[in-house]
């Protein structure tokens, strides 16, 4: 297939964009560029750790190994995914979204629209896919979990969505150095 591992520079840029997305959807209005840059650089390692832990959790659920940070090239367009696996002619596409505080409907809708575009692209190519989205909450509550799950079950019941507690993932997959 056309799936290729991201280079170090591409991976760093992906993490930077995700950190900016998290900040822009947060409750704080950021005014100073220096402040934004500092926050982005502080968030990047957290986002990377969240993705690693979420991929481990998804691997344990599905019993297959995922390759992290891959791109799919189609007609000179690059599509970047947090993780990818293939089993029995089905492509598993995984996207992880880290949520520090509350999550807005706008962000939920944005993730949904992105996944639906990807789904249509693969369908047009005749490729069987399973899309998995995981929201990893820094401040996990059952109300937030239900809010996310209810949104997706009402508008995209065919999409597989998980909501994980970041602290529980850290405990479950902690490694002794």
Short names for language-model regions:
Residues 82-94:
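Active-site beta-strand-loop-beta-strand hairpin of nuclease catalytic cores
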Residues 77-80:
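A short, glycine/Asx- and small/polar-enriched loop/turn
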Residues 1-2:
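Transmembrane alpha-helices and immediately adjacent membrane-cytoplasm interface residues
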Residues 91, 96-160:
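Catalytic cores of nucleic-acid endonucleases
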Residues 69-71, 136, 162-166:
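Conserved beta-strand termini and adjacent loop/short-helix elements that scaffold enzyme active sites
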Residues 172-177:
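Short, surface-exposed amphipathic charged segments that create phosphate/polyanion-binding patches used
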Residues 156-171:
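Short acidic-hydrophobic, aromatic-tinged amphipathic segments that line or gate anion-handling sites
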Residues 7-74:
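Acidic-basic catalytic patches of nuclease active cores, encompassing PD-(D/E)XK
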């Amino acid at each position: 297939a056309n799936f290729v591992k991201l280079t170090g520079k591409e991976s760093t840029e992906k993490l930077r964009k995700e950190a900016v997305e998290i900040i822009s959807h947060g409750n704080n209005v950021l005014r100073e560029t220096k402040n934004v840059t500092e926050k982005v650089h502080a968030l990047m390692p957290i986002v990377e750790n969240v993705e690693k832990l979420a991929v481990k959790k998804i691997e344990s659920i599905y019993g297959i190994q995922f390759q992290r940070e891959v791109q799919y090239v189609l007609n000179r367009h690059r599509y970047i995914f947090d993780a990818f696996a293939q089993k029995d002619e089905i492509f598993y596409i995984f996207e992880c979204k880290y949520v520090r505080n509350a999550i807005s409907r706008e962000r939920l809708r944005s993730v949904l629209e992105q996944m639906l575009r990807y789904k249509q692209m693969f369908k047009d190519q005749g490729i069987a896919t399973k899309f998995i989205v995981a929201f990893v909450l820094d401040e996990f509550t059952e109300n937030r979990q239900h809010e996310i799950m209810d949104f997706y079950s009402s508008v995209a019941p065919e999409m597989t969505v998980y909501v994980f507690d970041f602290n529980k993932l850290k405990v479950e997959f902690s490694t002794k150095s």
